[in-house]
UniProtKB/Swiss-Prot annotation:
<keyword id="KW-0997">Cell inner membrane</keyword>
<feature type="compositionally biased region" description="Basic and acidic residues">
    <location>
        <begin position="128"/>
        <end position="140"/>
    </location>
</feature>
<dbReference type="GO" id="GO:0008320">
    <property type="term" value="F:protein transmembrane transporter activity"/>
</dbReference>
<keyword id="KW-1133">Transmembrane helix</keyword>
<keyword id="KW-0472">Membrane</keyword>
<keyword id="KW-1003">Cell membrane</keyword>
<dbReference type="GO" id="GO:0043953">
    <property type="term" value="P:protein transport by the Tat complex"/>
</dbReference>
<comment type="subunit">
    <text>The Tat system comprises two distinct complexes: a TatABC complex, containing multiple copies of TatA, TatB and TatC subunits, and a separate TatA complex, containing only TatA subunits. Substrates initially bind to the TatABC complex, which probably triggers association of the separate TatA complex to form the active translocon.</text>
</comment>
<feature type="region of interest" description="Disordered">
    <location>
        <begin position="118"/>
        <end position="160"/>
    </location>
</feature>
<dbReference type="InterPro" id="IPR018448">
    <property type="entry name" value="TatB"/>
</dbReference>
<keyword id="KW-0812">Transmembrane</keyword>
<dbReference type="GO" id="GO:0033281">
    <property type="term" value="C:TAT protein transport complex"/>
</dbReference>
<comment type="function">
    <text>Part of the twin-arginine translocation (Tat) system that transports large folded proteins containing a characteristic twin-arginine motif in their signal peptide across membranes. Together with TatC, TatB is part of a receptor directly interacting with Tat signal peptides. TatB may form an oligomeric binding site that transiently accommodates folded Tat precursor proteins before their translocation.</text>
</comment>
<protein>
    <recommendedName>
        <fullName>Sec-independent protein translocase protein TatB</fullName>
    </recommendedName>
</protein>
<feature type="transmembrane region" description="Helical">
    <location>
        <begin position="1"/>
        <end position="21"/>
    </location>
</feature>
<feature type="compositionally biased region" description="Basic and acidic residues">
    <location>
        <begin position="149"/>
        <end position="160"/>
    </location>
</feature>
<keyword id="KW-0813">Transport</keyword>
């Protein structure tokens, strides 16, 4: 048990019987057995607690791994959203630039009383049609079409 053989245990028992006497010896043996059982139970409880703690540490490590994985996924999703927002921003900036170009074109045309560049093609087509129509129509009708064109141009000025 404690590195003692049978003969050594027998010597200890004989000394205990002589020292305690035959009346107190049985109670002392019961107390010693209870003490060793309590120590054994305490050691087993400590072992179980240690095993639980080790298991908790493993669970903590696993939880941290999942947390890191989750954070990485969230960051990757943020990256995707940011890229999509950047694309939308670039598209919006391009649209704003084209609208600003149109506004500048209108302002220049208003200052010089000419037709905006982007409308030149449309107007040249309309003028060609008007010339064809004007040869067949009377001067009064040609005057009406030019008045309508002037009204449309005035409406465009109001929107700007």
């Amino acid at each position: 048990m404690f590195g003692m053989g049978f003969f050594e245990i027998l010597v200890v028992l004989i000394v205990a019987i002589i020292f305690l006497g035959p009346e107190k010896f049985p109670q002392a043996v019961v107390d010693i057995v209870k003490f060793f059982r309590a120590v054994k139970k305490t050691l087993n409880d400590a072992k179980d607690t240690l095993d639980k703690e080790i298991n908790i540490e493993e669970i903590k490590k696993e939880t941290l791994e999942y947390q890191k994985l989750f954070e990485n996924k969230v960051e990757s999703l943020k990256g995707v959203k940011i890229e999509e927002l950047e694309d939308a921003k670039v598209t919006a900036e391009n649209e704003i630039k084209s609208i600003q170009d149109l506004m500048q074109d209108y302002k220049r045309s208003l200052e010089t009383n000419t037709i905006p560049n982007h409308l030149n093609e449309e107007v040249s087509n309309e003028e060609a049609l008007n010339k064809e129509v004007s040869s067949d129509e009377s001067p009064k009708e040609v005057q009406l079409t030019t008045d309508n064109n002037a009204k449309e141009h005035d409406k465009e000025k109001e929107h700007v």
